Regions:
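Histidine-centered divalent metal-coordination motifs
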Residues: 7, 54, 64-66, 226, ...
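Metal-associated gating/positioning segment near the N- to mid-region
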Residues: 54-129, 207, 239
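Active-site mouth loops of central-metabolism enzymes
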Residues: 77-90, 147-164, 222-224
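Divalent metal-dependent hydrolysis catalytic cores, especially in the metallo-beta-lactamase
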Residues: 91-117, 131-143, 174-188, 222, ...
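Active-site core of metal-dependent hydrolases
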Residues: 186-296
Length: 296
């Protein structure tokens, strides 16, 4: 069936000026034509979706999410991750639908505990049982025994354990491997994290990183690393990690390594701030009156 989608304007995300009065022609699951309304004839009996004064654009890609987290909830991030897997799966289904309704059509889930909740939700979306964006998932994030985020990942110390952990994550359904490669923890609370964690100390040796990448690449899977800064930035890029998550404390002399080895930075915390009691928080987004924002 052919569907015609009309709107006030279209942003094609190429840098071009918005197209006014666009019409998108969809045949089945594929967009076959985009044109302005004056240059296209819509059959009288056609299936038309008229978006009025709204703006159309390509789907957004969120490169770093945790399906068990929801900034609108009163619990801290850590408390949410410690909830039973069943509850986190239900909540995740709700937030993923909200993500899609906000325009996120693809997302990368980088660690949701040891129960593979992200795998379950990805597969349910793919089967059409729940509504949400297409997901790439890490299944089980990997961290050292003295690393950060104990509620998110499984422990692997040394080259042999690293290799086994990567294999296990792939067996459990991982599309991407997530490593916590910086932050050596000095405590269990967010206050410890804020005041005591060694954010620029490598959590793994360079050889451990190389082993993880070797094992992942054998299966055609890329590796992402939670990395704040320090020597591990260069180690990770040399080892072949595809992305560094956060990278808040990188230095100027790290930049050539990104250019040479082709890695990129994915920073999901652009709207987060850190509270010494509750941990990571978002601004009071619940107070925004989204329905009163002007069309753009």
């Amino acid at each position: 069936m052919t569907t015609y989608i009309k709107a006030a304007r279209l942003i094609d995300c190429t840098g071009a000026q918005p197209m006014l009065a666009p019409v998108i022609v969809v045949d089945g699951e594929y967009i076959t034509r985009i044109a302005d309304a004056a240059s296209i004839e819509i059959p009288l009996d056609a299936n038309v979706i008229d978006c009025g004064q709204d703006t159309l654009m390509a789907g957004l890609i969120d490169s770093h999410i945790h399906v068990g987290e929801d900034a609108r909830r009163d619990e801290s991030v850590k408390q949410q991750h410690l909830q039973p897997d069943g509850l986190r799966a239900i909540r995740g289904a709700v937030t993923l639908k909200d993500d899609l309704m906000c325009g996120v059509t693809s997302a990368r889930a980088l660690g949701d505990g040891t129960g593979c909740v992200d795998v379950i939700l990805r597969d349910a979306i793919n089967r059409g049982e729940i509504t949400g964006p297409r997901l790439q998932v890490a299944a089980q994030a990997i961290r050292p025994s003295n690393g950060t985020a104990p509620e998110i990942g499984v422990v692997a110390d040394g080259e042999d354990e690293m290799r086994k952990a990567v294999r296990r994550a792939i067996f459990n359904g991982a599309d991407v491997i997530k490593l916590f490669i910086s932050n050596v923890s000095r405590g269990e609370t967010y206050l410890d994290y804020l005041k005591g964690d060694l954010t620029q100390v490598s959590a793994y040796t360079k050889r451990e990183l190389e082993v993880a990448v070797e094992e992942a690449h054998r299966c055609g899977i890329k590796v992402a690393g939670h990395c704040i800064g320090g020597d591990v930035v260069k180690w990770a890029l040399e080892a072949g990690l595809a992305s560094l998550e956060h990278a808040n404390l990188i230095e100027e002399d790290d930049i050539p390594y990104f250019k040479k080895y082709g890695g990129y930075i994915s920073d999901p915390n652009l709207i987060l701030f850190f509270d010494p009691v509750r941990g990571f928080e978002s601004p009071t987004i619940k107070t925004h009156k989204w329905n009163q924002l002007p069309h753009w």
